[in-house]
Swiss-Prot record:
Heterotetramer; composed of 2 small (MOCS2A) and 2 large (MOCS2B) subunits. Gene3D superfamilies: Molybdopterin biosynthesis MoaE subunit. Belongs to the MoaE family. MOCS2B subfamily. This protein is produced by a bicistronic gene which also produces the large subunit (MOCS2A). It comes from Anopheles gambiae (African malaria mosquito). This is Molybdopterin synthase catalytic subunit. It is found in: Cytoplasm. It catalyses: 2 [molybdopterin-synthase sulfur-carrier protein]-C-terminal-Gly-aminoethanethioate + cyclic pyranopterin phosphate + H2O = molybdopterin + 2 [molybdopterin-synthase sulfur-carrier protein]-C-terminal Gly-Gly + 2 H(+). HAMAP family: MOC2B.
Length: 154
């Protein structure tokens, strides 16, 4: 089963862990991405996320299909992404994957966060302390980013 959600509400890590847990599984692996208070010497106050929601959910479903093709023993996949304002220390993304043994779930979680950042249309703006400046961030993994194009043959 896939448990996918984009929400403006605070993410509940424990609830997603419980959702993906399964009696046939000895492992639930989690990734929790949180807002940190700094970036390149600037003090970060909060993040703001926007998404092309219909396309994001569609892409997340395709990502789940790819995970299941690579790790056939994966049972449940949960991907919850926050939208709107996310203060420092709060979760912006939670990925939880269950499998009978830890190797598959650990590898699948690592793959999922990397692919999520590459392909799912969610955008992040950092707001900085001081003069109220902000900056839209570009993931270097994202295939349409300049950083990606500079480092890959297209």
């Amino acid at each position: 089963m896939n448990y996918l959600k984009l929400t403006f509400d605070k993410l509940d890590v424990g609830a997603l862990n419980d959702q993906v847990a399964h009696e046939s599984c000895g492992a639930v692996s989690l990734f929790v991405g949180t807002t940190r208070d700094n970036f390149e010497g600037k003090t970060v106050v909060l993040l703001e996320y926007e998404a092309y929601e219909a396309m994001a959910i569609k892409t997340m479903n395709l990502l789940c299909e790819e995970v299941r093709a690579r790790w056939p023993d994966v049972v449940n996949i949960g991907i919850h992404h926050r939208l709107g304002t996310v203060p420092v220390k709060e979760a912006s993304v939670v990925i939880a994957i269950s499998s009978p043994h830890r190797k598959s779930s650990l590898e699948a979680v690592h793959f999922t966060i990397d692919e999520l950042k590459k392909s799912v249309p969610v955008w992040k703006k950092e707001l900085y302390d001081g003069e109220g400046s902000s900056e839209w961030k570009e993931n270097s993994e994202c295939t349409w980013s300049k950083k990606y194009k500079d480092n890959h043959i297209l």
